[in-house]
């Protein structure tokens, strides 16, 4: 199975797998059952921003979700990613819809990772930034239903030609280049990721959510990982 660390924006509570009874953001370490969650005042039809950061000195993974003009939601969890993830990984975004649906539109996405070792010259870093997504992106690996639309947005799940979200959809987008996320001799391994998103839904209860995730380089969508499993996990264990 894939090794997954994720930050989830979970729009639909699945209390049977340990979700709180409201939309929330959460940190997932190798399981859909979040290690830490915070209530998320999701605003459909408004562009939101997510900022995720990790620092190997503090060993804390944190995420902040905000909408312009309203207060932000923060979640964090103390974890040493050296003990969880392989040394080389890929970073990605995933989303699903189920019986209920929503658009899972990504408008921009940036990521920076840094590895500092004792030798001053040896700093390993990777940076990418998408402000628009091209129609046939060479630098993204698109999986499942994910596609880039003519407006320059990344649609993680299916939408109709008129832009309406479709149910029972799962899609992911990964940056093509592997990331050297940690190294034994590194003094500091850190990363920052930011993305902007738009969730719209005709349903009273949108579903299911968007994630930023880090996984082994050969990761693929697990069979049966739709809906509440957010395209990341084969089961709810």
Swiss-Prot record:
Superkingdom of source: Eukaryota
PROSITE patterns recorded: LECTIN_LEGUME_ALPHA (PS00308), LECTIN_LEGUME_BETA (PS00307)
Location of this chain's protein in the cell: Vacuole, Aleurone grain
PTM comment, free text: The beta and gamma chains are produced by partial proteolytic processing of the lectin alpha chain by an asparaginyl endopeptidase. Mixture of 60% alpha lectin and 40% of its beta and gamma proteolytic fragments.
Pfam family membership, one: Lectin_legB
SUPFAM superfamilies reported in the protein's UniProt record: Concanavalin A-like lectins/glucanases
Annotated residues for binding of Mn(2+): 8, 10, 19, 24, 34
Keyword set, alphabetical order: Calcium, Lectin, Manganese, Mannose-binding, Metal-binding, Vacuole
Binding annotation for Ca(2+): 10, 12, 14, 19, 208
Keyword S-adenosyl-L-methionine attached: no
InterPro entries: ConA-like_dom_sf (IPR013320), Lectin_LegA_CS (IPR000985), Lectin_legB_Mn/Ca_BS (IPR019825), Legume_lectin_dom (IPR001220), Leguminous_Lectin (IPR050258)
Molecular function in Gene Ontology: calcium ion binding; D-glucose binding; D-mannose binding; manganese ion binding
Residues bound to a carbohydrate: 12, 99-100, 228
Recorded effect of pH on activity: Optimum pH is 6-8 for hemagglutinating activity. Activity is reduced to 50% at pH 8.5.
Gene Ontology CC annotations of this record: aleurone grain; vacuole
Assembly description: Homotetramer.
Record function comment: D-mannose/D-glucose-binding lectin. Has hemagglutinating activity towards rabbit erythrocytes.
Note: Binds one manganese (or another transition metal) ion and one calcium ion. The metal ions are essential for the saccharide-binding and cell-agglutinating activities.
Protein family membership: Belongs to the leguminous lectin family.
PANTHER family: CONCANAVALIN A-LIKE LECTIN FAMILY PROTEIN, LEGUME LECTIN DOMAIN-CONTAINING PROTEIN
Protein name: Lectin alpha chain
């Amino acid at each position: 199975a894939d090794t997954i660390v994720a930050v989830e924006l979970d729009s639909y509570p699945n209390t049977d797998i340990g979700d709180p009874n409201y939309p929330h953001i959460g940190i997932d370490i190798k399981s859909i059952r979040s290690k830490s969650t915070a209530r998320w005042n999701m605003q459909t039809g408004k562009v939101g921003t997510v900022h995720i950061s990790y620092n190997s000195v503090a060993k804390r993974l944190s995420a902040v979700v905000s909408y312009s003009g309203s207060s932000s939601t923060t979640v964090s969890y103390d974890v040493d990613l050296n003990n969880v993830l392989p040394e080389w990984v890929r970073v990605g975004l995933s989303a699903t819809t189920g019986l209920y649906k929503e658009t899972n539109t990504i408008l921009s996405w940036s990521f920076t990772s840094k590895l500092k070792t004792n030798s001053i010259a040896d700093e390993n870093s990777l940076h990418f930034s998408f402000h628009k997504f091209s129609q046939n992106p060479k630098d993204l690996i698109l999986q499942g239903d994910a596609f880039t639309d003519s407006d320059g947005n990344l649609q993680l799940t299916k939408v109709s030609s008129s832009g309406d979200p479709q149910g029972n959809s799962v899609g992911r987008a990964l940056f093509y280049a592997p990331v050297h996320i940690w190294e034994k001799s590194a003094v500091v391994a850190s990363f920052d990721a930011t993305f902007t998103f738009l969730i719209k839904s005709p349903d009273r209860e949108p579903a299911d959510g968007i994630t930023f995730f880090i996984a082994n380089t050969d990761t693929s969508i697990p069979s049966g990982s739709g809906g509440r499993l957010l395209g990341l996990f084969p089961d709810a264990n």
